[in-house]
Every structure is written in C-alpha cells, then in structure tokens.
C-alpha cells in the first residue's frame, strides 16, 4: 500500500497508509507519528471501529503548522466507494465522517487533500457515475469553522 506523509505542528511528521492486518476483512487505515529526530511511533488505526468491518484504501493526509491533521480515504461502508475522513483532536482520531459532496450516488475514489495557509480544507477526487464508467475530477472547498481559528 502507498504511504502518504504530512508535516503538522512545529516538527511532527505523520504517515498514513492502508493496511491489511486482519485477513478476514479488507484494508484499514493506519498511521504513525514521527517527532523530530525520533523514529516513527506505534501504529494506530485511524478509522473508527465501525469502519473496521468494511474496506478502506487510498489514504491521503494533510497537516498544518497550527497542529491540524486530517486523513481521508476511499471507504465502502455505505455500499459504494465514498470519501471519508477523520481528524486528530487532543491526540485521538475523531469518529469518521463521509465527506459531504463526495459520498452517495456514484463512485467517489482516490481522494487527495491539502490544508491552505488558513487551515481550510481542499479536496479533489475521481468521480464515476458507475464502476468502470468515465472519470471526472471533482473538487470541494471546506473552510475551517471560525471558532477554530
């Protein structure tokens, strides 16, 4: 599986990837932090327990100097490929959320994310009306809530 990397905070690096540790289920999203010159820490599962019963892959990550860290991936928990995400808050990963606009009818796959200088989220992904259909690139801008600034 492909590893995605992002710096966040003052000197932290986070790696995220899809990992098939449980041979009975599909891939899950894992991550690990590297602080400064230290080695990567323990692996943690990024997606929540509910997501553990479904396949996830194509992890992407975005970090910000203010400490924000978001991981997004392709997820099949609602019966089709959609973009889901989680963010790091007080050292714990949030419950997973389907990305509004990148879930529902059709196939939403291969997300890519970044945080701009204000901490606003930008997301692009591949959309298909059906599996194997022609592809379209979709984009979503999600401003950070004003109380979070």
Question: What residue spans do the PLM features occupy?
Answer:
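Extracellular, repeat-based ectodomains that mediate carbohydrate processing or recognition
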Residues: 1-149
């Amino acid at each position: 599986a492909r590893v995605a990397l992002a710096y966040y905070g003052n000197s932290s690096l986070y790696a995220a990837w899809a990992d098939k540790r449980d041979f009975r289920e599909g891939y899950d999203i894992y991550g690990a932090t590297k602080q400064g010159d230290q080695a990567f820490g323990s692996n943690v599962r990024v997606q929540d327990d509910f997501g553990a019963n479904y396949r996830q892959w194509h992890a992407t990550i975005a970090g910000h100097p203010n400490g924000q860290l978001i991981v997004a991936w392709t997820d099949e928990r609602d019966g089709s490929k959609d973009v889901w995400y989680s963010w790091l808050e007080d050292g714990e990963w949030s419950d997973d959320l389907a990305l509004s606009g990148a879930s529902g009818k059709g196939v939403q796959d291969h997300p890519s994310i970044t945080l701009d200088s204000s901490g606003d989220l930008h997301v692009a992904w591949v959309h298909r009306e059906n599996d194997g259909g022609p592809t379209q690139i979709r984009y979503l801008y999600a401003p950070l809530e004003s109380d979070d600034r």
